[in-house]
């Protein structure tokens, strides 16, 4: 029995957020075995580099590397074509869920309109998310969000969009 289940069966489910460079498949397996109690793990984001999906990222989400875990792979992309390419990998690996990262503040990525660097541009966010959902309607999409890149209220401009899209959730 996991330590959390013994505390209270009526508690909310726990979702394990990723930390780039730390919470890889080995960490997730060890955490699940030692602590348990996590309903869903999220992978660090999968991204494209030099026109290809990074091999390290693809290995990390391999189902064989994540046995007995409910893993939702996360991706980061500045446009719908790259996003679709990454989502196709998720589908190929058997995943039916994807988390789209609009929260990463890492300057090298954000300056290229990845992660929260896209938040000041609501039309780009709309194009990215709408295309993702239209192109992959069988994938349950969610969004990882930050308040903003330049201003905390940037996320508020996106609220109408989020309300009209069939997102599984926003974190």
What annotation goes with each model-predicted range?
Residues 8, 19-92:
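Glycine-rich, positively charged N-terminal anion/phosphate-binding segment
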Residues 11-13, 37-38, 67-70, 138-140, ...:
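A generic structural signal for alpha->beta connector loops
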Residues 14-17, 41-43, 71-75, 98-100, ...:
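Hydrophobic faces of well-ordered beta-strands that scaffold small-molecule active sites
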Residues 19, 23, 105, 117, ...:
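Gly/Ser/Thr-rich beta-alpha loop segments that engage phosphate groups in nucleotides
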Residues 30, 87-98, 102, 106-108, ...:
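Alpha/beta enzyme core
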Residues 47-50, 77-80, 103-116, 171:
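Conserved radical SAM core fold
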Residues 57-62, 116-118, 158-160:
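Short, hinge-like loop/turn segments at secondary-structure boundaries
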């Amino acid at each position: 029995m996991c330590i959390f289940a013994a505390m209270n069966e009526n508690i909310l489910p726990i979702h394990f957020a990723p930390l780039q460079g730390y919470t890889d498949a080995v960490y997730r397996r060890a955490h699940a075995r030692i602590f348990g109690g996590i309903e869903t793990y999220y992978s660090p984001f999968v991204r494209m580099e030099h026109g290809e999906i990074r091999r390290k990222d693809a290995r990390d989400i391999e189902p064989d590397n994540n046995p007995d875990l409910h893993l939702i792979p996360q991706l980061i992309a500045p446009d719908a074509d790259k996003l679709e390419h990454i989502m196709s990998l998720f589908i190929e690996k058997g995943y039916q869920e994807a988390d789209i990262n609009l929260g990463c503040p890492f300057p090298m990525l954000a300056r290229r309109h990845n992660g929260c660097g896209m938040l000041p541009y609501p039309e780009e966010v709309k194009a990215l998310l709408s295309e993702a959902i239209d192109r992959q309607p069988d994938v349950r999409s969610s969004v990882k969000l930050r308040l903003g890149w330049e201003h905390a209220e940037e996320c508020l401009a996106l609220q109408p969009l989020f309300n009209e899209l069939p997102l599984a959730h926003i974190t």
